């Protein structure tokens, strides 16, 4: 009997949490495409040059940086 009550309370608690989360995120999907575009634009694979401290073995360093060292990382001139 106690186990049944605990299970019922746990299920009700989880349902309330899901409903509360779904209600909070209802209006935030409006700009989803913009966030996705920005994430793709800023991803490591889409950049054409490496920033300070990044590896330059797969791509060239950004302007003002040069590839140097055994680890092949981008450093300032």
Curated annotation (Swiss-Prot):
It comes from the Eukaryota. It is found in: Secreted. The keyword Protein biosynthesis does not apply. Disulfide bonds join 49-62, 56-67, 61-74. Keywords: Disulfide bond, Knottin, Neurotoxin, Secreted, Signal, Toxin. Its main location: secreted. One of its GO terms (cellular component) is extracellular region. InterPro entries: Conotoxin. Residues 23-47 form a propeptide. Pfam families: Conotoxin (PF02950). GO terms for molecular function: ion channel inhibitor activity; toxin activity. Residues 1-22 form the signal peptide. The presence of a 'disulfide through disulfide knot' structurally defines this protein as a knottin. The cysteine framework is VI/VII (C-C-CC-C-C). Belongs to the conotoxin O1 superfamily. This is Conotoxin ArMKLT2-0322. It comes from Conus arenatus (Sand-dusted cone).
């Amino acid at each position: 009997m106690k186990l049944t009550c605990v299970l019922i309370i746990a299920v009700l608690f989880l349902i309330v949490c899901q409903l509360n989360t779904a209600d909070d995120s209802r209006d935030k999907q409006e700009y989803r495409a913009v966030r996705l575009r920005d994430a793709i634009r800023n991803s490591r694979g889409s950049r054409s040059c490496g920033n300070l401290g990044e590896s330059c073995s797969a791509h060239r360093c950004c302007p003002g940086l040069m590839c140097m060292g055994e680890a092949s990382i981008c450093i300032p001139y």
